[in-house]
Amino acid sequence: MPYIPHTPAEIREMLDAVGAPDVDALFAEIPAALRPQSFDLAKGATEMAVRAAMEKLSAKNRTDLTSFLGGGFYDHYVPAASDLLLSRGEFYTAYTPYQPEASQGTLQAIFEYQTAVCRLMDMECSNAGVYDGGTALYEALMMAVRHTRRKKAVVSETVSPIYRIVLATYTKNLHLDLVVVPHKNGLDDFEALTAAVDGDTAAIVVQNPNFFGSVQDFTALFDHAREKGAVSVISCYPVLQTVLKTPGAMGADIATAEGQSLGLPLSFGGPYLGIMTCKKSLVRQMPGRIAGRTKDAAGRTGYVLTLQAREQHIRRQKATSNICSNQALCALRALINLCLTGNEGLSRQAARSIENANYAAWKLGAIPGVKLLNEAPFGNEFAAVFPVNAKQVARMLMDGGIVPGFPLGRYYQGLENALLICCTEKHDRADIDRLARRLENAL
């Protein structure tokens, strides 16, 4: 396809159509200081010169910080073989064909991914993945709305505020009633949640561990939701599912997760992976694609797209999703990581992360004026309350090369002095001891 630039007349016509006086007006939201002053490109440079220029730009990013940030996105170790396997041309550049059975390797990879996450979550069905944890939770909510034909959802305030923003944005014009039930010191208010779920409720939406890191059992709440005809939706942390009570064991109808922790780099926020699993009774409401295994006429094993509710495959008005092929690569990375790590390795990863977090909580709890937000069990992160503003604490420690955690006051009123502190298996006791010393000195 040749590249033919637009004529001045065509550009003028497009600007008139959107009501812009000139091209610069299209970029008015970008501060002038950040806009390039000229688009005159220099002459070609050598590879060595380009590399030096890129390294100079890259040096502006700090990579020497010891980070205790979490909040849904975690710095776990990724096996070196992951990048090598993912970079194979058959996977890295392949596109999902519109005659999908022509690509048996891609379909088998999707099928194996679905099998792995179903086992991890203790659920019956999975799709090929969606964009991220937030969109997975939204899609789960819409599954519940379609299934129950109700327009009310009860959402715990302990669900990630980032996810709740996604829910509010996507449902803004869908006339859904999102009832957010306030937390109690970083814990789910079971009494209030139970009272909020009634005969008009499509879904109850919770998270485990919740955004504050606390671990709770939702079995009784899900039983109550079932009695009211509502769908139980839970958002999870995949790595910890090997040591916590699973969504399936709690009786969840739909379990979602942010799959970033399964081998995807943090990478400035993406691309990530939305994991979606559900009970078989809800599989027809599942968005995206679902790969299945069958036998051909000759009795040989073959893989097919059993369900494909994406708009590229069926009529738009019938589609439940427009999730595209890029997610298959992210799902493949999660599968590779799960296979390389194994169930035992994932359990060790989870146990070490929890052990480090408990050690950090013990060390910080010994600092005068510092206390935990609550006494509930937690996974690999916890909320600590300081006698001064948490943002101020974070700034002081960053100057010394430590990111101590996420200031909860950004999303929760009344918690301006609280930090969400996360540990993974990549931290050691020396890191945590240094964090405790710096915090004590800062206070």
Curated annotation (Swiss-Prot):
Q: In the Enzyme Commission scheme, what number(s) does this protein have?
A: 1.4.4.2
Q: What EC class is this?
A: oxidoreductase
Q: Which UniProt keywords apply?
A: Oxidoreductase
CDD domains found in the cross-reference section: GDC-P
Query: Which Gene3D superfamilies does the annotation name?
Result: Aspartate Aminotransferase, domain 1 (3.90.1150.10), Type I PLP-dependent aspartate aminotransferase-like (Major domain) (3.40.640.10)
Q: Which one of the record's GO molecular function terms can you name?
A: glycine dehydrogenase (decarboxylating) activity
Quaternary assembly: The glycine cleavage system is composed of four proteins: P, T, L and H. In this organism, the P 'protein' is a heterodimer of two subunits.
- The protein, known as: Probable glycine dehydrogenase (decarboxylating) subunit 1
